[in-house]
Amino acid sequence: MTKKRHLFTSESVTEGHPDKICDQISDSILDAILSKDANARVACETTVTTGLVLVAGEITTSTYVDIPKIVRETIQGIGYTRAKYGFDAETCAVLTSIDEQSADIAMGVDQALEAREGQMTDAEIEAIGAGDQGLMFGFACNETQELMPLPISLAHKLARRLTEVRKNDTLSYLRPDGKTQVTVEYDENGKPVRVDTIVISTQHHPDVTWEEIDRDLKEHVIKAVVPAELIDGETKFFINPTGRFVIGGPQGDAGLTGRKIIVDTYGGYARHGGGAFSGKDATKVDRSAAYAARYVAKNIVAAGLAEKAEVQLAYAIGVAQPVSISVDTFGTGKVSEDVLVELVRNNFDLRPAGIIKMLDLRRPIYKQTAAYGHFGRTDVDLTWERTDKAAALKEQAGL
């Protein structure tokens, strides 16, 4: 079947978006706990609305952290520092409702089913059972240097740049809430050739004009991020298309942890298992196995075994070994997908304990992932973004 030129769109949001505030609070609490108790079990959910933060969840730990203090410091760091923003780090109410992890769940995580039934060797007995059932996807493609789809890559860079020009006072009239969206045109061979549409909505001071915002964002945000060769005379720009965005953040919309799972991953370009990341320690396969799946997919593409690769992992609660591993290369693979699955099994320990060890996940590294994407990051060193398995995969594949 002949391929046609087509458009694909992805979005991102700034760290001041209500849902992203929640993700950052949840991961800040997780990091604070892990910095004192690496083996803590954390499932921390946050909701924000006008003048209020609620933190709830299940946390089992030997340490103490000051949750209201962490919440206020996180909000202050994002930039909600004045009451007239409708949400302020100093004056917002902070409510907490924290329980311990269910003993029924802990029983499966503490000792994997294989260990309880005597199926594992002594060396494997410490393997952790999956904290839940579920399916997770990882993806990589050769559209960008970081092996991510171009639409989400550009959307994240625009969102990050929006925050940079606000915080460094290049555009001091900007406020923390904002969203970006990028539509990329692909040619008949599935290669990105141009940017068709850019949408940016940003919260701002009430006295600034739309014309000023339009001019400044094109000059200081879009030009600074999007390669000039991708923009042409047909590219469309929608800057604050409603004309005004003064009321924003939690005053404009309530926020919840885990409501930006497509922004967090591949911008809709790859499939998603449905599980969110933020506020969860690494025994939760929603997070750790999604990171592992990205690690696998990225190394497959970096090894030249495929131009794009999507990896699916699936787990049963309390069972260490994944119940399934599959790889889809969308017809771009240099070897069969059966061979790729075998290579994955031979080179990656995809039991929860194996993932935690392989990617060193018991560290306080998570707040930095809670805005601008968990994958394709070039500004921070994330273990699942490394391509240290690529050479071995290539050699074992006989390429």
Swiss-Prot record:
**Which note does the record give on the cofactor?**
Binds 2 divalent ions per subunit.
User: Where would you find this protein in the cell?
Assistant: Cytoplasm
Q: What catalytic activity does the UniProt entry give for this protein?
A: L-methionine + ATP + H2O = S-adenosyl-L-methionine + phosphate + diphosphate
Question: So where does L-methionine get bound?
Answer: E58, Q101, D253, K284
What Gene3D superfamilies does the record point to?
3.30.300.10
Q: Which residues bind Mg(2+)?
A: D19
Q: One GO biological process from the UniProt record?
A: S-adenosylmethionine biosynthetic process
EC code(s) of this entry:
2.5.1.6
Q: Per the UniProt record, which residue ranges are transmembrane? A: none
Matching HAMAP family: S_AdoMet_synth1
Q: Which family does it belong to?
A: Belongs to the AdoMet synthase family.
- Protein name per its UniProtKB record: S-adenosylmethionine synthase
Q: Which organism is it from?
A: Bacillus cereus (strain AH187)
